[in-house]
């Protein structure tokens, strides 16, 4: 469990239990884009709103990060020579994405691995409960 996982647990808990509460996350890490909603705003350390870096859909932001990887976190791209533009084409055409993953078993393995590493919904429930119990002390 890393710091971003703990923050994600807290944010999701607040979003669920207090849906109208405003949440501000200050970070340079784009992993948090998957948590954006109408009441959750992300600012970088230079006080710039990162919500503008979003695709407009947290699920698409998540898929983009899964496909293009993240060098700073040592997460490789799923496909060689695949940047944001190509990844967005795949995201907007799920059938094509699935076809590409089926054609390239190594890409499929990377996609599944990246999903587990990046997607906050893969945080085991028992760890989420430990985090929430700890912060409620």
PLM region spans:
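Extended two-metal-dependent nuclease catalytic cores across DNA- and RNA-processing enzymes
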Residues: 1-136
């Amino acid at each position: 469990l890393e710091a971003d996982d703990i923050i994600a647990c807290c944010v999701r808990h607040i979003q669920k239990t207090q849906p109208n509460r405003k949440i501000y996350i200050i970070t340079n890490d784009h992993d948090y884009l998957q948590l954006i909603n109408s009441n959750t705003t992300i600012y970088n350390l230079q006080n710039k709103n990162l919500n503008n870096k979003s695709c407009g859909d947290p699920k698409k932001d998540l898929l983009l990060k899964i496909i293009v990887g993240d060098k700073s976190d040592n997460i490789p791209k799923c496909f060689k020579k695949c940047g944001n533009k190509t990844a967005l084409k795949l995201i907007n055409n799920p059938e094509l994405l699935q076809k590409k993953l089926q054609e390239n078993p190594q890409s499929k393995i990377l996609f599944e691995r990246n999903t587990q590493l990046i997607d906050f919904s893969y945080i085991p429930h028992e760890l989420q409960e430990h985090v929430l119990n700890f912060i409620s002390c």
